[in-house]
Amino acid sequence: MQQVAIIGSGNIGTDLLIKIKRRSESLSVAAMVGIDPESDGLARARRLGVATTSDGVAGLLAMPEFEQAGIVLDATSANAHRANAAALAPYGRRLIDLTPAALGPFVVPAVNLDEHLSAPNVNMTTCGGQATVPIVAAISRVTPVAYAEIVATVASKSAGPGTRANIDEFTETTAHALESVGGARRGKAIIILNPAEPPLIMRDTVLCLVGDVDRDAVTESIHRMIADVAAYVPGYRLKQDVQFTPVDPAEMRILLPDDTVDVRWKVSVFLEVEGAAHYLPAYAGNLDIMTSAAVRVAERIAGAEVTA
């Protein structure tokens, strides 16, 4: 059983705690770290018998439980993660970063986890990236994707101050991941915070421009990828049939890199991500997919270390 520490006692950190305690067969939480001694996350951790500190990463380093924690999951903020990574660097811990800091490579478990199992610090990109990069990758393994555009629509209630403050970073990081992990020549990301009441489940739209293509092969690849993601995010599903729409290459040229061949088809994929409601509400699929992906990464890293 691999011991882990969680830094951040907010919604994300607390959901990580509950997920690992309830369903992980290979991970155990050694310590929960926060900066607010009155936070609900630290209180829940204490009730579950997990050691806690409200003194941040300095408090973690002083805890006897730190010696057993080989993996640290950081659910704080980009600036805090940079400081935490520097403080933890001398101790050789494996870091899983759920912030926009992106000090290490982007990891989307269904796409590229095997490539980064030995990386000292991996970044979970964004909720939109975790939901949509797999679809772009599924299409690009069949045919080149000249342009990928995603629209992530999340319940406004699920977006806290940190998410709102990092909207620009969200779009930039997600677009980068569409290219560097998904394989698109050019990526664009848009996020919508939907204020509807009652809150709606996360929806994601993926639009890809491609050349002449085998529709059956693309559709089959997308369905395989959705099954791969649903293995660790059970609420991840296709909302409608995959759609193929012919496009005018001349009209699309403005969206494409200069050296891209003409595109012929727009592939449209419509997704829904329902949360598991372990700690967060079911509509917060945007948060659940991040924590579920991070737990999968931690479990795979732990398994790789056991077999090494």
From Swiss-Prot:
It comes from Parafrankia sp. (strain EAN1pec). It catalyses: acetaldehyde + NAD(+) + CoA = acetyl-CoA + NADH + H(+). SMART domains: Semialdhyde_dh. SUPFAM superfamilies: Glyceraldehyde-3-phosphate dehydrogenase-like, C-terminal domain (SSF55347), NAD(P)-binding Rossmann-fold domains (SSF51735). Keywords: Aromatic hydrocarbons catabolism, NAD, Oxidoreductase. The keyword Oxidoreductase applies. The active site is at C127. The keyword Translocase does not apply. GO terms for molecular function: acetaldehyde dehydrogenase (acetylating) activity; NAD binding. This is Acetaldehyde dehydrogenase 2. NAD(+) binds at S9, G10, N11, I12, S158, A159, G160, P161, G162, T163, R164, A165, N166, N286. GO terms for biological process: catabolic process. CDD domains: ALDH_C (cd23933). NCBIfam families: ac_ald_DH_ac, PRK08300.1. Its EC number is 1.2.1.10. Belongs to the acetaldehyde dehydrogenase family. Pfam families: AcetDehyd-dimer (PF09290), Semialdhyde_dh (PF01118). InterPro entries: Acetaldehyde_dehydrogenase, Acetylaldehyde_DH_C, NAD(P)-bd_dom_sf, Semialdehyde_DH_NAD-bd.
